[in-house]
């Protein structure tokens, strides 16, 4: 049968996938000449995004991937509010101030009942760390100027396990970064070594409450005690900043007796990520100071914008209000009891996953029981396969499990890491263990990539050696011929 009627040009009668918009390639790096229908734009983008990984199965990330529908609605209701318009959105500003005060008191800031805490909401812990670092640098510079001493070579002491934002701070704001190297079996900053590295130019020592490598808490109390002693001996006043990006919303609920916060006298500022275990979508972070004198007044800007004086201390200006509102929702919705329940569930699911991995008898666990709910583990035997192969094969099941090497002095250690978030259930933990076992079984039936690589390298080395032998032999032959030829020239015909 031959069709004699051509297809209609009326787009309104076509389904989305029958329209011309899915048959043509849109320009990727320049704006198109013509508009396209809204449903076409939506479908085209949605289809491309299907190739992204599933955020719920992204076990590499600490960032929250699930919130209650009521909070989702609040976020959408406030998505068009610019936070800097404080005079126009005074309630949003008030909610931020409430969050700052709740978090400061959660971290045991020495505040009177009616006293207002000093802190600010940020787009994440990276910005929070930049702000805290600037405050330390300015305080140190002011002190050195008053004493008539040089103030052009500030440094900061951290562990080699710090997040890259610390390196950014050091590079962007011209501060020397002095890192305490790690060692096998000890993957966090050693407080004794850190205290030894402190000198009169040290603006602060940064301790991590929840290393990104294995979730371990650094010993902030030990560091505080060592620095108190060193300050007394030297007359310095080296303070501590606690990077509690991951652990700040865990320790108060699970380890209330652990002294890491403003209970320690040298802890002057703390940052925490609301979008990690604060249980809010990216990106919201917080930084709070012990007292007003720990944040130099000259760093605070007073801006007359849209009719109101606005004190501000941020690295940007415009930003959304929705994440601040979402943080306030979680704080009042969950309360202490709710956060405690969530964190206990995370810890229990971490234990289930850890025990399941141990039962395979193929891995060493390098994470600690006390810390952020993370399971970091490495293969006992690397003769045939490695962690990167396991990470790659787990993606076939939908899991995103990162494999990486440790920092300086422990870089020969490779680990896999699973972050246990609120939405990682017991069922998923058991399923992941089963899928890891399947991957191990499959790897056992496959030829070793490592052996193959070594074999290829060995063959290449043999070829190289043979090539060198031939080259040497040819050089000898050419040299001998040249020698004989020269002899003939000198002696004539024999």
From Swiss-Prot:
Key word Transmembrane present? no
Activation and inhibition: Up-regulated by calmodulin binding at physiological pH.
Q: Name one GO molecular function term.
A: pyridoxal phosphate binding
Cofactor(s) recorded in Swiss-Prot or TrEMBL = pyridoxal 5'-phosphate
Fetch the InterPro entries from UniProt: Glutamate_decarboxylase (IPR010107), PyrdxlP-dep_de-COase (IPR002129), PyrdxlP-dep_Trfase (IPR015424), PyrdxlP-dep_Trfase_major (IPR015421)
**Which reaction is catalysed here?**
L-glutamate + H(+) = 4-aminobutanoate + CO2
Q: How does activity depend on pH?
A: Optimum pH is 6.0.
* UniProt xrefs under SUPFAM superfamilies: PLP-dependent transferases
Record GO biological process: glutamate metabolic process
UniProt site (Anchoring site for calmodulin binding): 488-489
- Can you name a GO cellular component term? nucleus
Q: What induces it?
A: Up-regulated by salt treatment. Up-regulated by nitrogen treatments such as ammonium chloride, ammonium nitrate, glutamate and glutamine but not by potassium nitrate. Down-regulated by hypoxia.
* EC numbers, comma separated: 4.1.1.15
Residues modified to N6-(pyridoxal phosphate)lysine: 276
The annotated phenotype of a deletion mutant is: No visible phenotype.
Q: Which UniProt keywords apply?
A: Calmodulin-binding, Decarboxylase, Lyase, Pyridoxal phosphate
Q: Name one Pfam family in it.
A: Pyridoxal_deC
Q: In which tissues is it expressed?
A: Expressed in roots, inflorescence stems, flowers, siliques and leaves.
Region annotation (Calmodulin-binding) ranges: 463-494
The record's note on its domains: The C-terminus (463-494) binds calmodulin in a calcium-dependent fashion.
Tell me, in a sentence or two, what this protein's role is: Catalyzes the conversion of glutamate to 4-aminobutanoate (GABA). The calmodulin-binding is calcium-dependent and it is proposed to directly or indirectly form a calcium regulated control of GABA biosynthesis.
What interactions and quaternary structure are annotated? Answer: Homohexamer. Interacts with calmodulin.
The family note in this entry says:
Belongs to the group II decarboxylase family.
Name-wise, this protein is Glutamate decarboxylase 2
Lineage of source species: Eukaryota, Viridiplantae, Streptophyta, Embryophyta, Tracheophyta
């Amino acid at each position: 049968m031959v069709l004699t009627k051509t297809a209609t040009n009326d787009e309104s009668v076509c389904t989305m996938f029958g329209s011309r918009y899915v048959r043509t390639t849109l320009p990727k790096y320049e704006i198109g000449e013509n508009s396209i229908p809204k449903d076409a734009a939506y479908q085209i983008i949605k289809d491309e995004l299907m190739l992204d990984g599933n955020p719920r199965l992204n076990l590499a990330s600490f960032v929250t991937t699930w919130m209650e529908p009521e909070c989702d609605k609040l976020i959408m209701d406030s998505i068009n509010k610019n936070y800097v318009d404080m005079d126009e959105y005074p309630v949003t500003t008030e909610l931020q101030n409430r969050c700052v005060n709740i978090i400061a008191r959660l971290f045991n800031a020495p505040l009177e009942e009616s006293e207002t805490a000093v802190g600010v909401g940020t787009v994440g812990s990276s910005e929070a760390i930049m702000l805290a670092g600037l405050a330390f640098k300015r305080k140190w510079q002011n002190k050195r100027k008053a004493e008539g001493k040089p103030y052009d070579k500030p440094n900061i002491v951290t562990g080699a396990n710090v997040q890259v934002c610390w390196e950014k701070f050091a590079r962007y704001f011209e501060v020397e970064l002095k890192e305490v190297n790690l060692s096998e079996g000890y993957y966090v900053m050693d407080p004794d070594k850190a205290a030894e590295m402190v000198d009169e130019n040290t603006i602060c020592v940064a301790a991590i409450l929840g290393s990104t490598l294995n979730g371990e808490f650094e010993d902030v109390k030990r560091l505080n005690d060592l620095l108190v002693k060193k300050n007394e001996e030297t007359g310095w006043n080296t303070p501590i900043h606690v990077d509690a990006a991951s652990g700040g919303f865990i320790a108060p609920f699970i380890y209330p007796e652990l002294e890491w916060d403003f209970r320690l006298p040298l802890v002057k500022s703390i940052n925490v990520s609301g979008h990690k275990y604060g249980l809010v979508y990216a990106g919201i972070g917080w930084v709070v100071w012990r007292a007003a004198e720990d944040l130099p007044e000259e760093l605070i800007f007073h801006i007359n914008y849209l009719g109101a004086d606005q004190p501000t201390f941020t690295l940007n200006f415009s930003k959304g209000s929705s994440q601040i509102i979402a943080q306030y929702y979680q704080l009042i919705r969950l309360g202490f009891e709710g956060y405690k329940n969530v964190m206990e569930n995370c810890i229990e699911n971490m234990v289930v996953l850890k025990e399941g991995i141990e039962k395979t008898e193929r891995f060493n666990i390098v994470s600690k029981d006390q810390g952020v709910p993370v399971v970091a583990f490495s293969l006992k035997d690397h003769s045939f396969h490695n962690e990167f192969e396991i990470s790659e094969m787990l993606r076939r099941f939908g899991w995103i499990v990162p494999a990486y090497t440790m920092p300086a002095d422990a870089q020969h250690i490779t680990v896999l890491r699973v972050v246990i978030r609120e939405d990682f259930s017991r069922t998923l933990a058991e399923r992941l263990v089963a899928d890891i076992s399947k991957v191990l079984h499959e790897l056992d039936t496959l030829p070793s990539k490592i052996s193959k690589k070594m074999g290829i390298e060995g063959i290449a080395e043999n070829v190289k050696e043979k090539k060198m032998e031939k080259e040497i032999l040819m050089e000898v032959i050419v040299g001998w011929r040249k020698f004989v030829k020269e002899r003939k020239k000198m002696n004539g015909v024999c």
